[in-house]
Amino acid sequence: MVPWLDPNDPFPPVERALGPATGAPGLLAASADLLPSRLIDAYLRGIFPWYSDGQPVLWWSPDPRMILAPAEFKVSPSLRKTLKRVLRDAAWEVRVDHDFAGVMRACAQAPRRGQRGTWITAEIIDAYTSLHRSGNAHSIETWHDGRRVGGLYGVAFGRMFFGESMYADATDASKIALATLVAHLRDQGLEMIDCQQNTSHLASLGGREIARKAFVAHVRRAAAEPPIPWQFDKRALAALTGPAGAAAPRGIER
């Protein structure tokens, strides 16, 4: 059994999350509230919400944790070709925080293999939009001919970014947004993007798992640092379109 949290109850230590032998590895707690203060506290502890309509708010801290180090981002030859085309063609834009709620709604509506419905409920959209208004959640959006065709959103504290979801209505549109974000974070010296759980898609882009203990320790350090600027555009992609496409790893603990 996982603990039920009343509004003033603190999170239990993440080490108490359910283990791999259970049906819900990483599940830590449940609650009825998704207040911004609760959400902020969760991220700073390496915890995130994930639940469906009709369920209580379920809080997770899996071990291991999937992350993407910007320095280890893999740019395939086909993606590099796409990014070069985006840089050349004025019809392509990458905008930051232009339509945050719209990106969230598009992510909610995007079909997911093996999933029915969405975990991005109206309650989730309201909570993360509140974080966006306070400067702690951002959207990176791919636009073509004046229409938003893909993007992603996530949470940011200090020098830590927590990726949440992405969508694409055009081929590679979400990858364009992710690549632009990665290029900006590399330029700012950020070492880690939280990806929460392992997927083959993330692994193909350079994502890997690290121990929860190492992840939480990194979050505590990075989130306490001054925030980075969140003004950039597709010109950041120039750093990824050279022959190498990836910088040397910066030594994140595994």
From Swiss-Prot:
Keywords: Acyltransferase, Cytoplasm, Transferase
Gene3D superfamilies recorded: Leucyl/phenylalanyl-tRNA-protein transferase, C-terminal domain, Leucyl/phenylalanyl-tRNA-protein transferase, N-terminal domain
GO cellular component: cytoplasm
A Gene Ontology molecular function term of the record: leucyl-tRNA--protein transferase activity
Catalytic activity: N-terminal L-lysyl-[protein] + L-leucyl-tRNA(Leu) = N-terminal L-leucyl-L-lysyl-[protein] + tRNA(Leu) + H(+); N-terminal L-arginyl-[protein] + L-leucyl-tRNA(Leu) = N-terminal L-leucyl-L-arginyl-[protein] + tRNA(Leu) + H(+); L-phenylalanyl-tRNA(Phe) + an N-terminal L-alpha-aminoacyl-[protein] = an N-terminal L-phenylalanyl-L-alpha-aminoacyl-[protein] + tRNA(Phe)
EC class of the enzyme, as a word: transferase
GO biological process: protein catabolic process
KW Transferase (keyword) present: yes
Subcellular location field: Cytoplasm
EC numbers on record: 2.3.2.6
Role, per record: Functions in the N-end rule pathway of protein degradation where it conjugates Leu, Phe and, less efficiently, Met from aminoacyl-tRNAs to the N-termini of proteins containing an N-terminal arginine or lysine.
Homology family: Belongs to the L/F-transferase family.
Protein name: Leucyl/phenylalanyl-tRNA--protein transferase
The species this protein was found in: Burkholderia vietnamiensis (strain G4 / LMG 22486) (Burkholderia cepacia (strain R1808))
Gene responsible for this protein: aat
